[in-house]
């Protein structure tokens, strides 16, 4: 899976004004869990709180906040036919301006989450290694393909780290504890 922190850093660098949209309560059947979050700028979003009308309403409220309409918003949204979302649960959303402290906290947490992902090492970047790396890159894993042939490492899936080395066994010694 692509590392979370670099795209987050890029988003924050490009957006001087950002609202944090957080699921503060999720009851019943909901698209995302309590604690899920996304960021909204005047012209872009990062992340998701579940999509659909719920997310559209939250984005609109976040952009209103960014436009100076209040200092914090709370939304209590029943997910039913009234809004065209069939989940059936109820979600409370908190929306606030992401100041420098909150931005740094989000980045620190993203880096910690990236580092905590399990590490998977694939030895060989041929057709099997490429297929495995493509499948594993979709999961919350740190995937590395270790190979002795430079051309076998070309065009690996996004988020897959590659290592060209004449002695692949050395990568085993460098692997974090618990790697597969």
What is the meaning of each model-derived region?
Residues 168-178:
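Short amphipathic alpha-helix with an adjacent loop that forms part of the alpha/beta core around
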Residues 1-164, 178-180:
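Segments forming oxygen-rich coordination pockets for charged ligands
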